[in-house]
């Protein structure tokens, strides 16, 4: 059994951190350990073996020295980093005593940071585009603790995510002017005021609402009331929220980002960062989504994007990497 350290160094517990938490609580083939920033340690599952450290910058000599000392004490076989910062740090202090696996969670312009790792994992094929190195795609998965919804109410369309430009909520709001359905956007972030102004400018205050990010348990209530989930991202590695909705048998329409082209037919995909294309698709399908049978898509996601399937793929990747030493 190998000893594998996962390393995250974030100021907030968001998508990447949830991904890591689910790996650490659902992977049983090897011994897993977490090194993370002390400010987010309490958000991880209490069963996880956690080493808490203070956050530090990529160029901090003292921070790297302390981390290198901790890694030597743990003596791992593999260190698995998540995101560019931790990948850069490990690449700069790595020794021959362990292998380095790095996961790319989004679509990044600068991917050279990752190429010093022994293996690069992408959450979608698009996240790995331009990587000329040992790489493998292991898609995101639907949340392992989700329970199927029994009584759907179809009260509103739903969009979920950080209120940042990359999520394309400005494009979504602008595209909503001719749609009858109400839209609920759930998320927090720096774009909130701009988005609320856009709602006012387009006279959509009666139809479009923004609600602060909620915990997973409360989000289920919004899923239960949703007729459709909309992904409007300008770019994205692999939208987890789409997998969750499809597992819960909520129809999804999306921009062509991440793994969505593996899941949805072309007619339910709009060109990314194209407001006109998004509006055309929304006007065609949002108010009539109940006429489009996505049962085959629901079944595909439940089977192919389960956490059990992805943990087996991750275990295979670890074992293959170890066999090359």
Task: Enumerate the predicted regions with their spans.
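Conserved acidic donor-binding segment of nucleotide-sugar-dependent glycosyltransferases
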Residues: 267-276, 283-289
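Short hydrophobic beta-strand element within catalytic cores of glycosyltransferases
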Residues: 251-254
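Short alpha-helical donor nucleotide-sugar binding micro-motif in glycosyltransferases
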Residues: 71, 213-214, 221-226
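Donor nucleotide-sugar binding/catalytic pocket of nucleotide-sugar-dependent glycosyltransferases
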Residues: 116-148
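N-terminal strand-loop element at the rim of the active site
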Residues: 6-63, 70
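Short His-centered aromatic/hydrophobic patch
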Residues: 60, 81-87, 104
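Aromatic "clamp/platform" in nucleotide-sugar-dependent glycosyltransferases that forms part
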Residues: 234
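A conserved mid-protein helix/loop that constitutes part of the nucleotide-sugar donor-binding site
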Residues: 14-22, 155, 159-178, 190-196, ...
